[in-house]
From Swiss-Prot:
Binds 1 zinc ion per subunit. Zn(2+) binds at C5, C8, C23, C26. The lineage of its organism: Bacteria, Bacillati, Bacillota, Bacilli, Lactobacillales. This is Acetyl-coenzyme A carboxylase carboxyl transferase subunit beta. Component of the acetyl coenzyme A carboxylase (ACC) complex. Biotin carboxylase (BC) catalyzes the carboxylation of biotin on its carrier protein (BCCP) and then the CO(2) group is transferred by the transcarboxylase to acetyl-CoA to form malonyl-CoA.
Length: 254
């Protein structure tokens, strides 16, 4: 099976890819399901809130059927996987957004799961690591999805007030309401190489300002250059770096 890297457009043979699903030519991390990332990222994992279900608050036509189909395909109840994880005996609270579940969009269940994750971490005095991947707020849930931005941010504020560490890893893509809220609230903000990070999409921006924008305007490398994030980390180095950050953060918090 062949595929083309979305970043460098190199034609890749699927067997060339390692477990990390990284382009060997440019280090771009292909979009992967949350459970795939979990398989190599942590040593142990206890899942939270796996039975939460959306109630389709706006009775959007076809929405419930789409959710049910994606739940069967991804083995997730919504667009984020949350739980308590460990790396080399370092316990922490972990959230991984899944770009294969309605493009990781932020709905009521996703917002509730992330809020509960921070509440658990605050109660148990744990750091939070959150991998973001999202197209933004979920249109099928309207204003209810937008309210999740404020709800999650409040839980983050309480976690921060307790003096606890919050690490964000921006993956491709991180856009819309997720970027405008909890994706940029971290104490430490990392990003994968060439990840798309922004608010509005390229086409929307160009149609609004009536001019073209630089091709790399919303790249992880460009936002690092302008000081919006702390570091770009290759996918295969994430576990080792997170272990060091969690250990350093736990010592500082003692």
């Amino acid at each position: 099976m062949w595929l083309r890297c979305p970043h460098c457009h190199q034609l890749l043979f699927a067997k060339q890819l390692t477990q990390y699903a990284v382009c060997p030519n440019c280090d771009y991390g292909l979009r992967i399901p949350a459970r795939h990332r979990l398989s190599w990222l942590v040593d142990s994992f206890k899942e939270f809130d796996k039975d939460l279900q959306t109630k389709n608050p706006l009775h959007f036509p076809g929405y419930q059927e789409k959710i049910s189909k994606l739940q069967r395909q991804t083995k997730l109840n919504d667009s984020v996987l949350t739980g308590e994880a460990s790396i080399n005996d370092q316990l922490f609270s972990l959230g991984i957004m899944d770009p294969t579940f309605i493009m990781g969009s932020l709905g009521t269940v996703t917002g509730e799961k992330i809020t509960r994750l921070f509440e658990y971490a605050t109660t148990h005095r744990q750091a939070v690591v959150l991998f973001t991947a999202s197209g933004g707020a979920r249109m099928q849930e309207g204003i209810m999805s937008l309210m999740q931005m404020a709800k999650v941010s409040q839980a983050i504020n309480e976690h921060a007030a307790a003096g606890l560490l919050y690490i964000v890893v921006l993956t491709d893509p991180t856009t819309g309401g997720v970027t405008a809220s909890f994706a940029m609230d971290g104490d430490i903000i990392l990003a994968e190489p060439h990840a798309l990070v922004g608010f509005a999409g390229r086409r929307v921006i160009e149609q609004t300002i009536h001019q073209q924008i630089p091709i790399d305007l919303q790249s992880a490398e460009n936002i690092l250059h302008h000081g919006f994030i702390d570091r770009i980390v290759k996918r295969q180095d994430e576990k080792k770096l997170l272990e060091w950050l969690l250990k350093t953060g736990s010592v500082a918090n003692e």
